[in-house]
């Protein structure tokens, strides 16, 4: 049965919840894409940043008290939140509050995900929540957290973990769990070397989405206990959850499904360059799994004031056009051909250039007579006339970063250009 979210209201349950978004991660597997920005600040989908997805899920779910915990190279992330997320109504108790690493308790930065929350425990307590919703700030998905909160209360859980089945070959990157017939978690291993398949699924296993609901008092107790633990890495997946299970507390798994019905939901980690490229180009499809045009579950973001995209020249030898593509505001396609690509804002492509199967981030300038295929161009790249990318991977490896799947990542530094943009 399809849910009608147009009449969604803020329930007492969501009002009693404080969301903490962990947004301090570096995302080192994204290579040079995170050299100057935190992973949650990485642009995605033509006009968004990754952090917009958990933030939008909170707002759409009715969870309007939100804290964002930052650490690694947070300037562009902080600026994005300040510019795009100032619409919350403070007089109604709504807010998006930034919590930078600031050595509040000890002379050290956040040592792990649990330590990040522990170091801000006084602020969390000051908001007096009944429940605490802890979210990873670096995943792309749509989810109604109200459903998960109701599930948590109905099952009388101390902690609830959002979960999804992932391919066994990818499970090393996640926390993997086992559950009984009532979805009570019986085992949890963070990033196992040899993950085991779920019963009845030979090529999949049940993985944590990095989404947790805690009874607030229970969370405080566990964080204080873990802070004094010897040789702890102070991480929810590595330390907190296994410790809770050893003490036989009630930890329940919440199977993730699509916000529009009961189908398995869209959820992407976009933790590698290949995954990032795939996730962006999936959006071009006729009916992509992630529908950015869904008016019932909008993804909110900072809206730059830009003119419409412009396609110029219609001569036989040069025609500005894009097919099977998404082109954002401020772009000028001047006698160039764009195919199966995603262009972010303010991208200029000059005459006789071809761009195919590529993701072009904001403020990129591409010269004349260029051929670019299966590439990611980072923000601010200025591609000289006649440049060829993606046709000779051995040559590309000498200048750029090339993935196992043959995606070529290009940054301004790789092109010999000075850093000019806040990314």
Curated annotation (Swiss-Prot):
Its EC number is 2.7.7.27. It catalyses: alpha-D-glucose 1-phosphate + ATP + H(+) = ADP-alpha-D-glucose + diphosphate. One of its GO terms (biological process) is glycogen biosynthetic process. Keywords: ATP-binding, Carbohydrate metabolism, Glycogen biosynthesis, Glycogen metabolism, Nucleotide-binding, Nucleotidyltransferase, Transferase. It holds the Pfam family Hexapep_GlmU. Coiled coil: none annotated. Belongs to the bacterial/plant glucose-1-phosphate adenylyltransferase family. This is Glucose-1-phosphate adenylyltransferase. It comes from Nitrosococcus oceani (strain ATCC 19707 / BCRC 17464 / JCM 30415 / NCIMB 11848 / C-107).
């Amino acid at each position: 049965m399809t849910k009608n979210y147009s009449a969604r209201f803020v329930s007492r349950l969501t009002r009693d919840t404080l969301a903490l978004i962990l947004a301090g991660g570096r995302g080192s597997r994204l290579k040079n894409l995170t050299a100057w920005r935190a992973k949650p600040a990485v642009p995605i989908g033509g006009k968004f940043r990754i952090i917009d997805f958990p933030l939008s899920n909170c707002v759409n779910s009715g969870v309007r008290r939100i804290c964002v915990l930052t650490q690694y190279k947070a300037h562009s992330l902080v600026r994005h939140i300040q510019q795009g997320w100032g619409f919350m109504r403070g007089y109604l108790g709504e807010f998006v509050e930034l919590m930078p690493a600031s050595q509040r308790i000890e002379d050290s930065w956040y040592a792990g995900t649990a330590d990040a929350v522990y170091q801000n425990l006084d602020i969390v307590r000051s908001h007096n929540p009944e429940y605490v919703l802890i979210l990873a700030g670096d995943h792309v998905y749509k989810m109604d957290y109200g459903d998960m909160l109701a599930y948590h209360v109905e099952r009388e859980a101390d902690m609830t973990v959002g979960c999804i089945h992932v391919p066994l070959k990818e499970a090393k990157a996640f926390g993997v769990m086992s559950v009984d017939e009532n979805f009570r978690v019986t085992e949890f291993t963070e990033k196992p070397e040899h993950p085991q398949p779920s019963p009845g699924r030979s090529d999949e296993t049940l993985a944590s989405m990095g989404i947790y609901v805690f009874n607030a008092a229970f969370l405080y107790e566990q964080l204080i206990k873990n802070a004094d633990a010897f040789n702890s890495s102070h991480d929810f997946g590595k330390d907190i959850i296994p410790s809770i299970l050893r003490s036989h507390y009630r930890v329940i798994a919440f199977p993730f499904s699509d916000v529009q019905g009961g189908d398995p939901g869209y959820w992407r980690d976009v933790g590698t360059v290949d995954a990032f490229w795939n996730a962006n180009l999936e959006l071009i499809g006729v009916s992509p799994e992630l529908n950015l045009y869904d008016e019932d579950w909008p993804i909110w973001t900072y809206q730059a004031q830009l003119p419409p995209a412009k396609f110029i020249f219609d001569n036989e030898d040069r025609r500005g056009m894009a097919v099977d593509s998404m082109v954002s505001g401020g772009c000028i396609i001047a006698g160039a051909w764009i195919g199966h690509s995603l262009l972010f804002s303010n991208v200029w492509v000059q005459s006789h250039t071809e761009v195919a199967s590529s993701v072009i981030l904001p403020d990129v300038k591409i010269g004349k007579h260029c051929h670019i295929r299966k590439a990611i161009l980072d923000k601010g790249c200025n591609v000289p006339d006649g440049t060829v990318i993606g046709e000779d991977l051995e040559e590309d490896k000498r200048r750029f970063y090339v993935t196992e799947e043959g995606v070529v990542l290009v940054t301004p530094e790789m092109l010999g250009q000075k850093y000019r943009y806040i990314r």
